[in-house]
């Protein structure tokens, strides 16, 4: 799963920087020099937002590998986290709404049109899917729950086994 997320960030970074170079849109602080951004304004163009692109793409990739029951349980939370990261960059004064929207659209375009054609990424998706689907019942590790706690909200029969942490 970590390899899948890392791949999503790397693909998003490369594609996003290509589009940033192509469109060369100035950031909000360049249009409003008095704008006091929360974070330092990056030196590269604003459009599309790479944070929105990368996190939307990673969210889509993670949801590809989750079993249906976990997708039903956590899909909304994954999408909300992805959206929040892009939205926070607008609040910080680093992006316009159009930058964030475009980043998300590019991620969905990549997922729909290209990810399925990349054999290496598909192999990583398959490996991540095996991690989550292992032997018909997913066992979550490294979570601070008591022994053999079932998460009832998911109705999935997920078993959380304490003491099986892998570091």
Which residue ranges define each predicted feature?
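Interfacial segments of alpha-helical transmembrane regions
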Residues: 1-12
